Amino acid sequence: MEFDPAKINTSSIDHVTILQYIDEPNDIRLPVCIIRNINNITYFINITKINPDLANQFRAWKKRIAGRDYMTNLSRDTGIQQSKLTETIRNCQKNRNIYGLYIHYNLVINVVIDWITDVIVQSILRGLVNWYIANNTYNPNTPNSTTISELDIIKILDKYEDVYRVSKEKECGICYEVVYSKRLENDRYFGLLDSCNHIFCITCINIWHRTRRETGASDNCPICRTRFRNITMSKFYKLVN
């Protein structure tokens, strides 16, 4: 099932954005609550509202060696203290629509999403998170934001155009399909490894990552076998600064 942004209802309570993905014909109602941190740099997602079992699984995973190592590496890579990678909004009458455990979006996309057994919900969740981030990366009303000149805008557009031109020709190193030509829109994203520059579509590298984890194997690049820690979902073949 292809992700459809037209099926998103957006609302907010206090500092929490609530995305409701509603697909009545397919009996799908997926709520995703998102908090942007005070610097508007990163995002935290409520996994309790997606499924209460996910919060319990996450707490158990965080206590295991793999979880502790992942949290340590994520804290180092993001510069965020481990204690700040999660946030809890308590359950009370005022917060009944937004309470729960919020965790850094990297943990959702690279860890928690693999615990969801329904592949349709997986796909929709990934699409929702990506859609929200893509539409909220720059907010001209953010306090202390820097004014961008017309010349700066032209330079930015030129840079993105160059990266897009290269990206649209790139093939996944696993399925050998051109990433931008894949049938499903949600598959037309790159999965960037933090250890090397090999090219993969997000779907193939996530399947590889999940399979390696299930078999107890190391998280190694399928091509060069260099060990990686994180997978970043990106519309381009490389990160654009």
From Swiss-Prot:
Keywords: Host cytoplasm, Host-virus interaction, Metal-binding, Modulation of host cell apoptosis by virus, Modulation of host ubiquitin pathway by viral E3 ligase, Modulation of host ubiquitin pathway by virus, Transferase, Ubl conjugation pathway, Zinc, Zinc-finger. It catalyses: S-ubiquitinyl-[E2 ubiquitin-conjugating enzyme]-L-cysteine + [acceptor protein]-L-lysine = [E2 ubiquitin-conjugating enzyme]-L-cysteine + N(6)-ubiquitinyl-[acceptor protein]-L-lysine. GO terms for molecular function: acid-amino acid ligase activity; ubiquitin protein ligase activity; zinc ion binding. The keyword Zinc-finger applies. Residues 21-131 form the KilA-N domain. Signal peptide: none annotated. GO terms for biological process: protein polyubiquitination; symbiont-mediated perturbation of host apoptosis; symbiont-mediated perturbation of host ubiquitin-like protein modification. Its EC number is 2.3.2.27. A zinc finger (RING-type) spans 172-225. GO terms for cellular component: host cell cytoplasm. InterPro entries: E3_ubiquitin-prot_ligase_p28, KilA/APSES_HTH, KilA_N, MKRN-like, Znf_RING, Znf_RING/FYVE/PHD, Znf_RING_CS. PROSITE patterns: KILA_N (PS51301), ZF_RING_1 (PS00518), ZF_RING_2 (PS50089). It is found in: Host cytoplasm. The RING-type zinc finger domain is required for E3 ligase activity. RING-finger E3 ubiquitin ligase which catalyzes the formation of both 'Lys-48'- and 'Lys-63'-linked polyubiquitin chains. Plays an important role in virulence by acting as an anti-apoptotic factor. Belongs to the orthopoxvirus OPG021 family. This is Host range factor p28. It comes from Ectromelia virus (strain Moscow) (ECTV). The gene is OPG021.
